[in-house]
């Protein structure tokens, strides 16, 4: 490709709140259980599958993580940057609902600077709110569903060549200012059509001389977590999940999960391992597709030389025999499981299909730790149906019990569900049935909540069993107790544990002072600006607990040199903008 060739698609990832550099919002722990910060700067994996698929079609794509650029350089101007770009189309993700503010603001700026350039939005939240979204003047198109790569190609070609739009599947668009909704009919029966290509990220860095725009989240270079999709859709019915079977049936029209073939899945794992030494997450439970499928994946992994940590996610308890098969097939492996609560009744109130008691959970934990499992993370949630304040504290006591019967490879985490209920989830659609009171129904409702002064007021729900204030109390009390248990059983160092304890105390103090000045929100927030920023990260745990041990060198130099050679031999380098 030559420098003069136009950019077919500029993919932009916005911060959660566009004005985060100017506003003092006390986010608390809402991002403590994910790799990114309260800016929610991690772009969806779909950016990489889109870029990979479009490149195969001869199209040119650039990913720009505006959130990271804005975080790393406070003088970075989004309008000035966008004015320097000349794409044929602009794509903006609204996948996770916490981007409701930033995504719309970036779209507005893009449309003001490039009024003739179409703005396309996509993602699960875009899919749910597509009719409301298309009503915003800055949004021209919304692509619905969980696999929009092929419809996106059709749309870009139609826009370039003047083709008809009414035949493009999954598209919501405007005609003479009025919304048009094409049927959501594109549902690929396999996920083999697009890879998560880490080498494509390197090529973008080389082409634009711009590392900051491509990194998935701030700190990724030090902790290069990677992932591959194993499935889209789900067989389970968890009431709080925005990707449950019922939700997918209505939202993306998937009435059953679709899986990536074992051959394609393992080939993608191997390709990632050639470049990156970090852990590789298998997104989704392999056992959803059946034991034969899962065994086939393990057999192919056994035949590879992958040295990365391979992280297995389980929605239900895996059979002991399957854990042993993992142990004999994968050199380095870890596992994650999310019982959500220690309380069987609370767990059952989710109305999912995984039914196990604590004794069975403990048997699997002990078996995994008897094997070569490097790390075992157990996740619990606050804000569930039928969950009381006392139940949350009892869950933390159960975590201490798990520490007592295990070793340092096991860790437990607990966090509030939020800041929003998942749109399309059963609790979102039937809040009264599950005991919820919701404070946001529309996209605009959620956008407005995001700029409230504290996470207590950002929360989009409360339950029959806990108000928003009680959810916050339960969170800080649980975090404090869990931190003490981690110190007691050596899960974290004294230094880190003390730092977490100090942050929890400071967060409580900030909450009290904000509440005392709730009628003077702006002044109170401005007065606490430095403290709010400092104590809105690693509040309820040290975020470093989420990451695996670092390597001295996280990337494989030989593979990078190979990419460099192939890249420059084709004359693809361009001057950075």
Predicted feature descriptions by range:
Residues 3-12, 120, 261-375, 382, ...:
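Conserved SAM/AdoMet-binding glycine-rich loop
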Residues 2-5, 21-24, 174-230:
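N-terminal [4Fe-4S]-dependent radical SAM core
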Residues 53-57, 62-190, 424:
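Glycine-rich beta-alpha loop elements in corrinoid/cobalamin-binding modules
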Residues 7-39:
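Short glycine-rich His-centered loop
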Residues 1-7, 11, 60, 82-85, ...:
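Radical SAM enzyme core and accessory elements
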Residues 130-137, 386-401:
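Catalytic cores of alpha/beta
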Residues 19-20, 129-130, 236, 248-249, ...:
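Flexible glycine/acidic-rich beta-alpha junction loops that bind and position SAM and/or redox cofactors
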Residues 218-261:
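Canonical Radical SAM [4Fe-4S] cluster-binding loop centered on the CxxxCxxC motif
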